[in-house]
Regions:
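Exposed, flexible binding/inhibitory loops of compact, secreted disulfide-stabilized domains
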Residues: 1-67
């Protein structure tokens, strides 16, 4: 069975809840919750999921592994 690598269903959800769900689905990856304008490193990391939130703390981009 393949492991989950993206969470389109979390767009529109509070970022804190999204991070919790990703952690439950994939405890082997680190979850980074990023506010608008946060600096990003361009490195590829297959053990990371970035959760991009808007000014209201809502996920606005599909969280995916390694992006």
């Amino acid at each position: 069975m393949s492991q989950k690598s993206s969470w389109p269903e979390l767009v529109g959800v509070l970022a804190t809840l999204a991070a919790t769900q990703i952690g439950k689905d994939r405890p082997d990856v680190a979850v980074e919750v990023l506010p608008p304008g946060a600096p990003l490193t361009p490195d590829f990391n297959d053990k990371r999921v970035r959760v991009f939130m808007d000014d209201n703390g809502i996920v606005f981009k599909i969280p995916v592994i390694a992006k």
